[in-house]
Amino acid sequence: MFYPVVQILIGIILVIILILGFYHLKRKPPKKKCKTDTDCKDKGHHCVRGACTDKSCLEAVKQDIKDIKLDPTIRSCDYAPGFYRFNATTADLQSPFGKTRIDLGKVWTTWSKEDEYCQSLCLQHKGSIGWEFDEMSLRGEGNCYCYTNSHPALKNSNNTTVMGIARNVL
């Protein structure tokens, strides 16, 4: 008398297990957690907000830095360790971000990495989230600026300006 009921219950349980099995197979595996780009090197991806991604640098900037304002003429950037690097870009000096500009004066190095030297100077400045290097001559001399406002506003500039905005890697 209970035999058909038991068969139906076993059938229902098997159908539920089958449905759950298919659901589990269709789910995407969780994104790999990361702290730096080197954690994502196996696929050529970059680390953005703690997850490996293959997004373009500009897409990553918009996801990573909330409330960033980018001039529509800015079409690209590069991933750099700890920073997003923009060529021919400067801060909008009329914005709250631009008004936090700290002029570190002229810098010059003999190792032809003036922008990296400017970056290292700004990293030593408390609260700095961005840096800008404006090359004045081909001899490696230029002006170095740091920024402390956490809502960047960037616009196009001359070809000798390099800007870096800190990445929010977890």
UniProtKB/Swiss-Prot annotation:
Residues 23-170 are virion surface. It is a single-pass membrane protein. Keywords: Early protein, Host cell membrane, Host membrane, Membrane, Transmembrane, Transmembrane helix, Virion. The chain crosses the membrane at residues 2-22. Its main location: virion. It is found in: Virion membrane; Host cell membrane. The keyword Amino-acid biosynthesis does not apply. Induction: Early structural protein. GO terms for cellular component: host cell plasma membrane; membrane; virion membrane. It comes from the Viruses. Residues 1 are intravirion. The keyword Membrane applies. Belongs to the asfivirus envelope protein p22 family. This is Envelope protein 168. It comes from African swine fever virus (isolate Tick/South Africa/Pretoriuskop Pr4/1996).
